[in-house]
């Protein structure tokens, strides 16, 4: 039993790398026009370099550039409740603070007659940092249960834990667009994706009695993961006066990261009365061997998969008047066939479905306002949700505006937020203990953005 509890704690620490921001593995908000309208897959403006490359066949003749900056704030909290735990109730909220510095994205496009060439650089997957200053339930509950088995109740020792992780997928995309006739265009492209992440954490428990202050358990992990992948992209666009219909397909990106493990260690107080005098601690390779093949995935040089799923995006846009435009859009991410660590993708009920709508209105020649919404359904299951990686279905709302500074320059500003549905998971034999526990996963998300578009 003790070995099982210790394994649960170490495994939680070792899998902390799967914490990420954004969707399951994909971001779509690169340009500020998306943040203030959402449905942008039928656009012919500069942000089409990502959302509708084929649409650039009807875009600005010559060069265009766009530089965008976003600042996100997120919370990812876990409410844990274990009735009757160690003779009382265990109720604790673990606050996860997810943040990122200013997130930039750069767009460029050049069109001449029937040809267009475009590029985009940004954070295309995951994105951000997350930190739990008090660890997570997968740390605390099994360790407290293990120490209670050895006769040590919570008032006899100090417990501390910390977990933080980073997960970015940087992308550089290049497209070639061809106008086929007066109504149809097509584009092909490729995106290079670079995964850069780490997970660092510790769990420590020591006796409060002085002068001994004996360490009972100490777990440490510092693992950096990096890897490359490439995604071909095809898109098509139909344009007829006020109507635009588009489709874009991104192929699955295989990303196999390689560990650069700086620290992977366990030090455990030996409570076996027959051997404790000679070997007071189990540590080093001997301690890790107790956990079998499970820790092998986090050894230096080991590989972990973080595939980005294939994506189908279809949209229709319509200009009701020269001043009023609207669009509807649908995304399908085939998450069930994008390999994740431990094959977790197989536990999803289905791939991610997203429904988007947006409207934009030109007040005059200088100012534009817009708003939009998005519904995201991940197909989540209890088996998929983990302390170290969880998602919540959401509604997102965005608004903002644009200022045409002159004929060449446009300033975009935006704000959007996501309203998440809490996910409740109840588990018998919670974290390897004989108790039933319940976890409630919740999230918040707010993003402000500013960007400048420039036409040469």
Regions found by a protein language model. Name each.
Residues 1-21:
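Gram-negative bacterial Sec-dependent N-terminal signal peptides
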Residues 15-16, 64, 185, 424:
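Hydrophobic alpha-helical membrane context
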């Amino acid at each position: 039993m003790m070995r099982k509890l210790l394994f649960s704690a170490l495994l939680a620490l070792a899998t902390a790398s799967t914490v990420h921001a954004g969707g399951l593995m994909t971001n779509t908000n690169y340009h500020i026009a998306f943040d203030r309208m959402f449905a942008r897959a039928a656009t012919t403006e500069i942000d089409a370099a990502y959302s509708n490359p084929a649409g650039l066949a009807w875009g600005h003749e010559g060069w265009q550039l766009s530089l965008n900056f976003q600042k996100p704030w997120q919370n990812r909290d876990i409410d844990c409740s274990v009735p009757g735990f160690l003779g009382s109730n265990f109720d604790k909220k673990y606050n996860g603070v997810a943040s990122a510095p200013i997130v930039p994205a750069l767009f460029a496009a050049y069109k001449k007659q029937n040809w267009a060439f475009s590029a985009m650089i940004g954070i295309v997957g995951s994105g951000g940092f997350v930190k739990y200053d008090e660890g997570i339930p997968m740390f605390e509950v099994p360790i407290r249960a293990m120490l209670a088995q050895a006769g040590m109740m919570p008032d006899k020792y100090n417990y501390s834990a910390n977990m933080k992780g980073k997960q970015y997928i940087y992308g550089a995309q290049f497209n070639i667009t061809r106008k086929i006739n007066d109504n149809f265009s097509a584009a092909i492209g490729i995106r290079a994706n670079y995964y850069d992440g780490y997970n660092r954490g510790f769990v420590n428990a020591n006796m409060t009695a002085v002068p001994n202050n004996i360490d009972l358990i100490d777990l440490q992990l510092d693992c950096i993961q990096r890897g490359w992948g490439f995604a071909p992209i095809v898109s098509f666009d139909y344009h007829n006066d006020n109507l635009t219909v588009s489709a874009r397909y991104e192929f699955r990106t295989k990303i196999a990261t390689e560990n650069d493990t700086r620290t992977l260690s366990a030090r455990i107080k030996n409570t076996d009365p027959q051997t404790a005098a000679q070997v007071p601690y189990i540590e080093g390779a001997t301690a890790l061997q107790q956990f079998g093949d499970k820790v092998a995935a986090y050894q230096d040089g080991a590989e972990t998969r973080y595939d980005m799923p294939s994506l189908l995006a279809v949209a229709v846009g319509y200009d009701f008047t020269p001043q009023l435009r609207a669009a509807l859009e649908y995304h399908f991410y085939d998450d069930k066939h994008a390999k994740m660590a431990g094959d977790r993708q197989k536990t999803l009920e289905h791939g991610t479905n997203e429904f988007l709508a947006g409207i934009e209105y030109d007040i005059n020649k200088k100012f534009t306002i817009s708003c939009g919404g998005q519904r995201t359904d991940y197909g989540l299951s209890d088996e998929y949700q983990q302390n170290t990686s969880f998602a919540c279905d959401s509604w997102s709302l965005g608004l903002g505006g644009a200022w045409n500074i002159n004929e060449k320059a446009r300033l975009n500003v935006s704000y959007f937020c996501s309203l998440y549905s809490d996910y409740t998971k109840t588990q018998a034999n919670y974290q390897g203990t004989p108790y039933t526990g319940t976890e409630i996963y919740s999230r918040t998300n707010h993003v402000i953005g500013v960007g400048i578009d420039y036409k040469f």
